[in-house]
Amino acid sequence: MQTIPHVPVLYREVLEQFKNIKNGIVIDCTMGYGGHTSLILDANPNIKLIAIDQDQSAIDFSTKRLEPYGDRVVIKKGRFSTIIKEILKEYDISDIRGILADIGVSSLQLDKKERGFSFFSENLDMRMDEDAPLNANIVINEYSSHELQRVLLEYGELRNYKQIASFIVSNRPFYSAKELSDALRHLMPSGKKIHPATLLMQAIRIEVNNELGELESLLDTIQERKFLDTKVAIISFHSLEDRIVKNRFNEWRASCICPQEAMRCTCTNDNSLGNILTKKPIIAQMDEIQANPRSRSAKLRVFEMKK
């Protein structure tokens, strides 16, 4: 008997968006341990769900957890930016009613110290796909100072990124996430509720897993293929991701795609892909935050492609 590891973030809000689907296919781009997947399947008995994940341990767990759904669920291993393109070759795009992506590291990955995501881990790894070639050890101990500066500035938005990069290069090698975060504590912003090394670890993790590139690629595919009558829901956990989603949804909603400097519209003014269903991002309710403090940073934005 498997123990269900956790309740998925924003579970009520996600279910509200993906209920009463009469038929068709829903794609869960970030299956994890099957929380959102099972909720959506239970709420919509006539749909099929394609679940994607790159973490083999999550796939092993969810394969067993989702067995009762039989052929209603198909699990695919890999990065969603790649797998969704394969799905569109196998299935009719007109059958796809929903796309869900819960971006970022899962609670289960954070809690497994051997994965190297935690500040207290004795490893430097941070790979969501443990077969991927790039890991945190390479970023920290082999990247040049210039490369580290790019990572810390672009993905951590750290003001003293040059100072931190210089310190890392001068004091490496580092062998664990704990050693790294402890050594850099004096250079990290303090006085906030978050751990001083949060932005540092975020920056390294994003680099290792190409998280922003994956998100951009997913949104590119959705935009290029012009899904019809499909609901797209993205959960993000920090401002970099949320900014990408917000800006892209605004682009999709726009009817006119002429350059801002254009004197008059020459694009037919009929290019809108649909409507934004969330004027502001949906956030977790207080009872969920109390039960799962990590849900505090979760933001859900939803776009509905036109019919």
Swiss-Prot record:
The keyword Transferase applies. It catalyses: cytidine(1402) in 16S rRNA + S-adenosyl-L-methionine = N(4)-methylcytidine(1402) in 16S rRNA + S-adenosyl-L-homocysteine + H(+). It is found in: Cytoplasm. Its main location: cytoplasm. GO terms for molecular function: rRNA (cytosine-N4-)-methyltransferase activity. The keyword Cytoplasm applies. Keywords: Cytoplasm, Methyltransferase, rRNA processing, S-adenosyl-L-methionine, Transferase. S-adenosyl-L-methionine binds at residues 34-36, 53, 88, 102, 109. One of its GO terms (cellular component) is cytoplasm. SUPFAM superfamilies: Putative methyltransferase TM0872, insert domain, S-adenosyl-L-methionine-dependent methyltransferases. InterPro entries: RsmH, SAM-dep_MeTrfase_MraW_recog, SAM-dependent_MTases_sf. One of its GO terms (biological process) is rRNA base methylation. Its EC number is 2.1.1.199. Specifically methylates the N4 position of cytidine in position 1402 (C1402) of 16S rRNA. Belongs to the methyltransferase superfamily. RsmH family. This is Ribosomal RNA small subunit methyltransferase H. The gene is rsmH.
